[in-house]
């Protein structure tokens, strides 16, 4: 099976003779059946004939590319038919060969693999948006029928990324972005971390060349010094393992470049302040030994509370299993992540679905074995009537990076990046979502709409008086949460708005509507007489803050204020520091009892509050009510005054507001 250092070596090969020799040697070592070897070498001859005289942008003979793609597949120990398809994956598109000839030389199964890869055109050869989304939907369709197709495509993408520097800079950036946003998440969802890691780093290299070089040089210059700090502890663990009679392999690994870059973006911009650039991995034979090793590790190094993750008891969606713990190295107070798993778990961690072919002759991997594939199938069924797909929907439902949070009982919950406590609540149970009042994140009170982060412990507090709010639709990320909230709104409070299709307008599939809805704000009907800063925690400008509605006032606290715990049933409200006043365009949608006199009333309050009216549209609902959609321009302070005035008008039943950039309306 291919190791990480081998991938690093192989992606640098650009000599045809060297590529051919390594490929032949790998085939001889991997495929023991004579018929399989002869079939692969026959495909190599055919590929060399068909691609003769063709060259890549780098000036290399084109045949190097399919040889390298198939070399990756052979190193992954995929079946011989997949390796043949890798050699011939471009012949239908780039040569004059007919499909019938492939069937005659090989069989229908190999043709199906080649045809499947051919249909997945690279995204940079397409126009953006809808065509791009349809291309990805084809990829997903192929994936659900035969997972080998996407593994071949990932190998194809890996080698193409190695020759990206020969393309114009704008094409490099576009292809690298597509790789990072589409192919990397797919590799991650399929659990093929060895491919995911190199696709990430190659994309990073082209998108952020200065940062890439800085990190590479830093790791190279400090490698020996960093590894020395772990050596003493590593020896102590090895000694304890020998005493316990446990056979295990301990390796010190360096975090890959892009993961370090992400930490720099979220924690600190200074590379010298990123301490956990190294990790330790311990591979053992049996599952029960993982927990014994964990106990030994915690004897040698002090564990960090709350940083133990048991993915053995609760595997990730892509079948990943491992124990993760973070410990503190006493020599320099450095934090180190340690992963503990069995050999089988390690194969699945590195090679994901491809691991199913290792040591399992003639055993077919079924698409149903992976929940990610099942999710794709379900998405395709639900979208069966769509002739076109939205990239926003695809990324939101299928490709987003996931986060992993915990219930108070320690159960792992996987959520799309950007999810909040409402998403979490609906995953646990619909009733918990419908009645969610507030959350505790790592023991601290938090708003249920605040985005969650990896490894947080989430506890939901409910109330029978609490109910879903239409504003929740603006912040949730999971389809289940959106569906359940809409279902509740349809049955309960917002019937007038739902009946008049306003909710559908605001949360519809149209891209521009979604863009507007992302800026939708709601206002409480509670009359607030006073807003005050809590004198004890005394938050300052720029700090994370939260508001507590107490009687007729809002008390603003620092999010870490211990005083928050004293409220039995706090009514949380999201608050933020006021930005410098700027003029924005605001769509104000009003549901009216009657239309009479509304024009003069609105004109009067706009004039009094320095608000410029851009347009006004009024419609009769046909049920005694009216709807007006007003577009105005002003700063946030004046708009707030207007909203307050509108709430006092008994003719106005409900108010919705959407904010947009003024530049879209200025001539």
From Swiss-Prot:
Known pathway: Purine metabolism; ppGpp biosynthesis; ppGpp from GDP: step 1/1
Cofactor: Mn(2+)
Keywords attached to this entry: Hydrolase, Manganese
Residue ranges of domain TGS in the record: 401-462
Protein origin, superkingdom: Bacteria
Catalytic activity: guanosine 3',5'-bis(diphosphate) + H2O = GDP + diphosphate + H(+)
Keyword Transferase appears in the UniProt entry: no
GO molecular function per UniProt: guanosine-3',5'-bis(diphosphate) 3'-diphosphatase activity
EC number: 3.1.7.2
Function recorded in the entry: In eubacteria ppGpp (guanosine 3'-diphosphate 5'-diphosphate) is a mediator of the stringent response that coordinates a variety of cellular activities in response to changes in nutritional abundance. This enzyme catalyzes the degradation of ppGpp into GDP. It may also be capable of catalyzing the synthesis of ppGpp.
Similarity comment: Belongs to the RelA/SpoT family.
Protein name listed in UniProt: Guanosine-3',5'-bis(diphosphate) 3'-pyrophosphohydrolase
Species in which this protein is naturally found: Borreliella burgdorferi (strain ATCC 35210 / DSM 4680 / CIP 102532 / B31) (Borrelia burgdorferi)
Higher taxonomy: Bacteria, Pseudomonadati, Spirochaetota, Spirochaetia, Spirochaetales
Gene: spoT
């Amino acid at each position: 099976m291919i190791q990480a250092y081998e991938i690093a070596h192989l992606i640098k090969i650009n000599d045809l003779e060297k590529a051919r020799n390594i490929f032949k040697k790998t085939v001889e070592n991997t495929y023991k059946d004579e018929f399989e070897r002869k079939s692969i070498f026959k495909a190599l001859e055919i590929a060399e004939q068909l691609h003769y005289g063709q060259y890549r942008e780098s000036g290399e003979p084109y045949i190097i590319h399919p040889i390298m793609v198939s070399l990756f597949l052979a190193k992954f120990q995929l079946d011989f038919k997949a390796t043949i398809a890798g050699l011939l994956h471009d012949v239908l598109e780039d040569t004059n060969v007919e499909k019938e000839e492939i069937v005659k030389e090989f069989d229908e199964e190999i043709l199906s693999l080649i045809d499947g890869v051919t249909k997945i055109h690279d995204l940079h050869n397409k126009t953006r948006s809808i065509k791009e989304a349809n291309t990805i939907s084809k990829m997903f369709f192929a994936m659900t029928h035969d997972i080998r197709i996407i593994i071949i495509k990932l190998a194809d993408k890996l080698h193409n990324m190695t020759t990206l520097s020969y393309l114009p800079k704008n094409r490099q950036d576009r292809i690298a972005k597509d790789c990072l946003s589409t192919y990397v998440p797919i590799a991650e969802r399929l659990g093929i971390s060895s491919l995911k890691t190199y696709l990430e780093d190659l994309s990073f290299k082209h998108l952020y060349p200065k940062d890439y070089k800085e990190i590479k040089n830093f790791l190279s210059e400090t490698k020996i010094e960093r590894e020395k700090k772990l050596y003493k502890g590593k020896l102590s663990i090895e000694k304890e393992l020998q005493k316990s009679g446990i056979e295990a392999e301990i390796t010190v690994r360096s975090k890959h470049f892009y993961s370090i870059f992400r930490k720099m973006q979220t924690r600190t911009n200074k590379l010298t302040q990123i301490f956990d650039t190294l990790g330790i991995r311990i591979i053992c034979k049996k599952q029960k030994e993982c927990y014994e090793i964990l106990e030994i590790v915690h004897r040698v190094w002090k564990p960090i509370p709350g940083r133990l993750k048991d993915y053995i008891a609760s595997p990730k969606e892509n079948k990943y299993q491992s124990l993760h713990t973070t410990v503190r190295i006493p020599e320099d107070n450095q934090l180190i992540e340690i992963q503990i798993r069995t050999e089988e778990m390690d194969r699945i961690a590195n090679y994901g679905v491809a691991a199913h072919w290792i040591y399992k002759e003639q055993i077919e991997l079924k698409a149903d074995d992976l929940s990610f594939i099942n999710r794709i199938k379900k998405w395709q069924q639900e979208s069966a009537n769509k002739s076109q797909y939205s990239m926003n929907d695809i990324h939101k439902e299928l490709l987003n990076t996931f986060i992993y949070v915990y219930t108070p009982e320690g159960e792992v919950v996987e959520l799309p990046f950007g999810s909040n406590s409402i998403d979490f609540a609906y995953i646990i149970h619909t009733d918990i979502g419908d009645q969610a009042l507030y959350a505790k994140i790592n023991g601290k009170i938090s708003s249920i709409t605040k985005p969650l982060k990896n490894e947080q412990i989430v506890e939901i507090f409910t109330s029978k008086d609490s109910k879903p709010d239409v504003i929740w639709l603006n912040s949730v990320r999971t389809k289940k949460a959106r569906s359940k909230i809409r279902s509740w709104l349809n049955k309960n409070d917002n019937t007038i708005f739902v009946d008049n299709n306003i909710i559908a307008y605001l949360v519809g599939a149209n891209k521009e509507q979604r863009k507007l809805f992302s800026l939708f704000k709601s206002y409480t009907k509670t009359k607030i007489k006073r807003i005050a800063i809590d004198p004890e925690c005394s938050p300052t400008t720029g700090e994370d803050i939260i508001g507590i509605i107490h009687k007729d006032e809002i008390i603003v606290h620092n999010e870490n204020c211990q005083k928050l715990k004293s409220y039995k049933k706090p009514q949380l409200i999201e608050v933020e520091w006021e930005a410098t006043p700027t003029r924005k365009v605001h769509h104000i949608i009003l549901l009216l009892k009657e239309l009479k006199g509304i024009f003069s009333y609105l004109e009067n309050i706009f004039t009094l509050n320095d608000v410029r009216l851009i347009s006004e549209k009024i419609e009769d609902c046909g049920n005694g009510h009216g709807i007006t959609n007003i577009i105005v321009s002003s700063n946030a302070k004046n708009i707030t005054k207007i909203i307050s005035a509108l709430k006092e008008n008994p003719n106005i039943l409900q108010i919705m507001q959407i904010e947009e950039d003024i530049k879209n309306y200025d001539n």
